[in-house]
Regions:
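Membrane-proximal, glycine/serine-rich, low-complexity loop/turn segments characteristic
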Residues: 1-142, 162-201, 239-262, 297-299, ...
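Outer-membrane beta-barrel translocator domains and adjoining extracellular loop/strand segments
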Residues: 3-6, 79-95, 139-154, 200-211, ...
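Extracytoplasmic loops and strand-loop junctions of Gram-negative outer membrane beta-barrel proteins
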Residues: 34-40, 93-100, 153-161, 172, ...
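Outer membrane beta-barrel strand-and-loop segments of large Gram-negative receptors
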Residues: 100, 233-235, 267, 276-286, ...
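Signature of Gram-negative outer-membrane beta-barrel scaffolds
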Residues: 250-352, 523-525
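Feature captures outer-membrane beta-barrel proteins of Gram-negative bacteria and organelles
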Residues: 336-342, 395, 412, 493-501, ...
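C-terminal beta-barrel architecture of Gram-negative outer-membrane proteins
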Residues: 509-579, 607
């Protein structure tokens, strides 16, 4: 085997999946296929989703392959949300924030992928990759919110209407050249990259904000804004691999990249039919990140194990021009970035892997902008051009084993990330009007540990299988609250237990339970520690009868509880469907079903952060009926492939009404 760029070049080989495709024809506006869902499987809002795409792949010559695709999707979301938030302050009583909003979001997305892989001769090849996306979005929202002190005294109230329209274009291109020398294992590769991103947007804010207390007043805002973001990135990587004999390899590499950003945000105050620029909210900002990184790696392979160690030296330069503030930024950051990997194969079915790597975590262009964002006048955000990159240590361990004779499997996966000079949020709350301002800052460090385990055991006498998968995560970080340092410790434990019973191809029963308990502790006031639990219980059954008929039922019970606020919400969801398999080899399936039979049109999300606990409820698609037809091409071409009850490969056509 050739070891081309063994520190990561093989990742492009992992993206391949099964063949086939899918055509989705939708006749109504309630189907949510392909729409991202939130935790617990309950979507937010009512969504209408249209999607379609086409693949075109062709061998242009014996040595040249063309792979291309186009995909389009349109998502229209109508959402109603209610938010209840308890905010905690150091050495002060807590206060409550409540918000209700009605909004609509419309997104149109186009994506084009084009890859040309040209094998020049037995020693040389070149690969061109291009990804293009274009999107248009439009958001509208009407929001009412209020803040009350701990004794329920009204402190402020806001009514606002926001609009935002945006178009964006992104291009990412790369050219990879690979050369194999006559000496086995000696290789040379170079990869050139180009990235272009253009975003144009405009928005409006109309709000009435009432403040009570010692300085009662009413503030009315009528503003419009325009914003353009332009980014160009150029880079290249050169990698040389030299075999040292005895299945040992030495790699030398060098990477260079520059990111140029231009940001312009202009806010106008509208009053009496006249528009004037607001210099406090407007911002023109240019920046250039320049990365330079030489590195060296050593790898050794043995029959049972292999390992690699290496180090890179990264120099990062940030040059910025704050045009509206007449200020300039010129800073440089330097770090050594070591890496180590170890793999041990006990057998073909038992593996152990350790990985350690370091990285620089640069702030985003949004975090660096010194602009004040007041789209929510009670919750203001501002950037920080003085941010420095964080330095992260990432350690992971992965163990997998499978007994093919007993069909017992087990895996354990753990990660730990320790970041120094980490980027965190600094929040300040004005004690007179309870307006909150957030700003990214550098803090000393933070730590995050995650664990994921799974054990699968068959029970042959009962035609059953049991899976148990505990999970945990620990986060220990620093945030600033009213200029006081607050270390927050967050622990989440939970997991999933699943039982499956199968009787021939007639009956399949699946029972599962998922639990997640999160506890958050604060240094500044332990009496304000928070805890909440989310539970999901699922029962599903598939019954095949009269050879070609199948009855599907599923019942999900979602339970959300807060130990801090006594919040409790339970949501039962019942789905029933009847299928009839048609045509030769049962390649067609006609299905009639009713989803959410109990008409539960609510979803819940609980969140705990550095200084607040929040519950958000959203409207959800209620009871609806669906008729679908699926035609599986792979079963027509291969009658032995694709059984009932599983995922069908090949081409599928679904019609929903």
């Amino acid at each position: 085997s050739d070891f081309l760029n063994f520190t990561g070049g093989s990742q492009q080989m992992m993206g391949g999946g099964g063949g086939g495709g899918r055509v989705n024809i939708q006749l109504d506006g309630d189907n949510t296929n392909g729409v991202p869902l939130n935790f617990g499987g309950r979507q937010n809002g009512i969504m209408t989703n249209y999607a379609g795409g086409i693949n075109f792949n062709r061998d242009l010559t014996k040595k040249a392959q063309l792979t291309s695709s186009y995909f389009y999707n349109r998502i229209d979301q109508d959402i109603r949300q209610g938010t209840d938030r308890i905010n905690f302050l150091p050495n002060q009583p807590s206060y409550n924030f409540n918000e209700n909003s009605i909004g609509s979001n419309l997104n149109d997305n186009h994506r084009v992928n084009l890859t040309l892989d040209q094998k020049i001769d037995s020693a040389n090849s070149i690969k061109f990759t291009n990804n293009i996306t274009y999107s248009e979005s439009s958001q509208r929202s009407t929001t009412n919110s209020e803040t009350r002190s701990n004794d329920n005294t009204l402190q402020n109230k806001s009514e606002r209407f926001n609009t935002n329209d945006q178009t964006s274009f992104n291009l990412n291109s790369s050219a990879l050249f690979r050369h194999r020398f006559a000496k086995k294992g000696r290789t040379l590769s170079t990869n050139l990259t180009l990235g272009i991103s253009e975003t144009d947007g405009k928005g409006n804010l109309n709000s009435t904000n009432q403040f009570y207390g010692n300085n009662p007043r009413v503030e009315e805002l009528s503003q419009r804004n325009t914003q353009t973001n332009s980014t160009q990135s150029y880079g290249g990587t050169l990698t040389y691999t030299e075999p040292l004999g005895g299945r040992k390899y030495l790699e030398a590499n060098y990477s260079y990249r520059t990111n140029q950003n231009q940001v312009e945000r202009i806010v106008y105050n509208e009053k009496g039919g006249a528009s004037t620029i607001d210099p406090f909210l407007s911002n023109i900002y240019n920046s250039n990140y320049i990365y330079s990184r030489p590195g060296v790696n050593f790898r050794m392979n043995r029959q049972k194990y292999n390992f690699a160690v290496g180090v890179g030296y990264q120099n990062t330069q940030l040059k910025g021009d704050l045009i509206t503030q007449n200020a300039k930024i010129n800073r440089s950051f330097e770090n050594f970035l070591p890496v180590a990997r170890f793999n041990y194969d006990f057998s073909n079915f038992k593996h152990l892997r350790f990985d350690y790597e370091t990285s620089m975590q640069e702030p985003s262009i949004q975090q660096l902008q010194p602009a004040v964002i007041n789209t929510d006048p009670l919750n203001i955000s501002v950037g920080n051009p003085d941010l420095r990159p964080g330095y992260a240590h990432n350690l992971s361990a992965n163990f997998t084993t499978f007994n093919p004779s007993k069909f017992i499997n087990f895996f354990a996966f753990m990660t730990a990330v320790y970041t120094t000079n980490a980027i965190a949020n600094s929040q300040s709350v004005d004690p007179t009007n309870f307006v909150r301002t957030s700003k990214p800052v550098n803090v000393r460090d933070n730590l995050r540990i995650n664990g994921n385990f799974n054990l699968g055991v068959p029970i042959k006498n009962l035609n059953s299988r049991f899976n148990f998968g505990p999970t945990f995560s620990i986060t220990n970080g620093i945030n600033l609250l009213n200029d006081l340092e607050n270390r927050t410790k967050q622990q989440t434990v939970g997991g999933t237990a699943r039982y499956n019973y199968t009787f021939k191809e007639i009956l399949i029963v699946d029972l599962s339970a998922n639990l997640s308990r999160q506890q958050t502790e604060y240094d500044f006031n332990q009496q304000q520690n928070q805890a909440f639990i989310n539970r999901t219980y699922t029962a599903e059954a598939n019954l095949t009868f009269l050879k070609n008929y199948q009855l599907n039922t599923s019942y999900n019970y979602y339970s959300y509880n807060s130990e801090t606020t006594n919040f409790s919400q339970n949501i039962p969801v019942l789905n029933i469907g009847l299928s009839r398999f048609l045509l030769k080899n049962n390649v067609g399936e006609l299905k009639i079903g009713v989803n959410n039979l109990l008409d539960q049109n609510l979803s819940v999300n609980q969140t705990a952060t550095a200084n607040y606990l929040q519950q958000t409820t959203s409207n959800n698609l209620g009871r609806y009926f669906m008729v679908s037809f699926t035609y599986a091409l792979n079963k027509q071409l291969n009658p032995m492939g694709g059984g009932r009850g599983g995922r069908r490969g090949g081409m599928q056509m679904i019609i929903n009404n």
